[in-house]
Amino acid sequence: MMKFYGQFDPPVDRFIFERYFPDLGTQGVFVECGAFDGQTECSCRFFEETMGWKGYNLEPVPWIYERLTQNRPMSSNLNVGLSDRTGTQRFQSVVHPVYGRDTTIGAVEHSPALKEYLIAQGCTFEEITINVLAWNDFIHRQKISRIDLMVLDVEGHEASVLDGMRDSDVLPSVMCVEVGHSGFGILRDILAEMGYEYDVSSNANAFFLRRDVLPLFAFRSAAQPKTAVALPIPDEIISRADLDELISERDQLLIRLG
């Protein structure tokens, strides 16, 4: 029986597997940015464990990175974050009254609303300095020439990471981007400029395909049994107008894919 680790229902990794890579024989390379400990709510462990994929896990918080290396010894694990530049960055680690420093909600900068909520829950903040890489420095240092899947969940820093990926010769075929903090519209526009088409949404994540690989995924889709289309992002995450536009773009893409 296959084991999935991702957040939500259906789990993120199961959703990605069934929609984009449903053949267990498909080989690939993934990048998970914001990997945490490599196990808790992990979106890519399934692909390494079950399908034998090569993986790169990026986690900038030192004490969490230590657990990542223990949980995922077969991956390439990096104690860095991605950004629009290479260097260092101030980072707000969250100390939870129950879970302590082991939380998934640290961020370069929390939104005022989220910070107010966390304080109300009894959380405190510990400022640390993390190392960050621009995308091109990351792929050149790791000698990466192909990426099939990237999962990007960095608590509101997504736009900066994407800005650092512009004009790169190596871009992921499939992008899974958490949109709840930065906003769907902003991220959709950046990715469109980078050569991506919006596909579908599931829970807090939006999925994008690189335009040049659309025929490949159309072929894979045609070979699989038809299933229900995933629900769009909930209303509380984006505006009704954005949601209507998102659904329209999804429908247009499905028409193009046949």
Where are the regions a protein language model picked out?
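Phosphate/nucleotide-binding beta-alpha loop and adjacent structural elements of enzyme active sites
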Residues: 1-258
